[in-house]
């Protein structure tokens, strides 16, 4: 509905603003506004979108009560002009501006020679971030306590939650980074596949169709049984239903909960989405390849990994060049 992308415009830290997108049923990519947003004005944009929906939203059909359908009805230019009208009205009231102060980290860095997929070197010399990804976003309380206990005695530490169920522990010097890597080793995802994303799903979610957490665990367990530890497949994004809480429609590999009839019985299944992207200037929705039985998906993912490894290319390139091979593999399991 409303997205902010941080940019550096000739030395000015601003946001590029996207409006009118959305996932779920009938997903759409958003459109970019022509003007950039100052960080202290973001709440004005939020209020403007609220007012636009109040005035233009569909109150008769709940299935159409989404911003993207207003964009579809109006067309891009009229929709953008309508938003700007509401934005100008909100800005003229001058009630929602923020006072944002940039925080500078002056901590002295220490270099480390350690190499790890979860270790990220920051712009500041000798400072690092350590990424911790609880499998399925389900963090063990003991591990969290160990992290808190370690960072309590460290200076200027920040924790940043990600949109992919992970945590960046920031502003660590080299020695501190090594300590955090040791504390979190084996406690979360180390490969991209182990860093997959899953909504909570059945049985917790009341509207979900698929047991997304169980699906993820079954995939990872299958790879462990095969002793396959190569970092070949990307993170899989799993949603228990079409609402896309797991962001499956924008992922390189996505699954969404379904039901499928097999031998006259209704079984748990997931719809397969491949090659979605949400990078700047290259956003696209994933292609749907079909519906697979949940019990067969771990084997499917394993065979897919073998095919990608055989081609010796990154998965992004494989998904672009070998669509027919993916379709053939899906057909094998249908």
Stretches found by the model and what they are:
Residues 311, 316-334:
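Radical SAM enzyme core and accessory elements
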């Amino acid at each position: 509905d409303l997205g902010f992308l941080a940019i550096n415009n000739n030395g000015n830290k601003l946001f590029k603003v996207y409006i009118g997108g959305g996932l779920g049923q009938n997903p759409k990519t958003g459109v970019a506004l022509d003007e950039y947003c100052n960080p202290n004005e973001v709440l004005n944009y939020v209020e403007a979108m609220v007012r636009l929906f109040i005035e233009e939203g569909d109150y008769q059909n709940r299935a159409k009560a989404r911003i993207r359908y207003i964009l579809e009805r109006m067309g891009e230019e009229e929709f953008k002009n309508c938003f700007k009208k509401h934005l100008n009205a909100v800005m003229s009231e001058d009630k929602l501006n923020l006072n944002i102060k940039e925080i500078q980290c002056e901590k002295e860095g220490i270099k480390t020679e350690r190499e790890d997929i979860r270790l990220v070197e920051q712009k500041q010399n000798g400072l690092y971030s350590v990424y911790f990804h609880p499998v399925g976003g389900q963090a063990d309380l003991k591990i969290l306590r160990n992290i808190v206990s370690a960072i309590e005695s460290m200076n200027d530490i920040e924790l940043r939650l990600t949109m992919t169920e992970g945590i960046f522990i920031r502003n660590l010097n080299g020695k501190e980074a090594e300590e955090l890597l040791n504390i979190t080793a084996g406690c979360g995802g180390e490969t991209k596949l182990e860093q997959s994303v899953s909504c909570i799903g059945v049985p917790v979610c009341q509207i979900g169709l698929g047991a997304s957490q169980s699906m993820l665990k079954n995939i990872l367990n299958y790879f462990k049984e095969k002793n396959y530890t190569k970092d070949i497949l990307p993170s899989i994004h799993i949603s228990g239903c079409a609402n896309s809480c797991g962001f499956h429609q924008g992922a390189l590999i996505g699954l969404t909960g379904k039901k499928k009839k097999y031998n006259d019985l209704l079984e748990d299944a997931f719809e397969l989405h491949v090659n979605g992207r949400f990078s700047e200037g290259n956003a696209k929705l994933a292609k749907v390849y079909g519906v697979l039985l949940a019990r067969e998906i771990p084997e499917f993912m394993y065979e897919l990994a073998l095919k990608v490894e055989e081609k010796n290319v990154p998965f992004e390139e494989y998904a672009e060049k070998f669509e027919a091979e993916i379709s053939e593999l899906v057909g094998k399991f249908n």
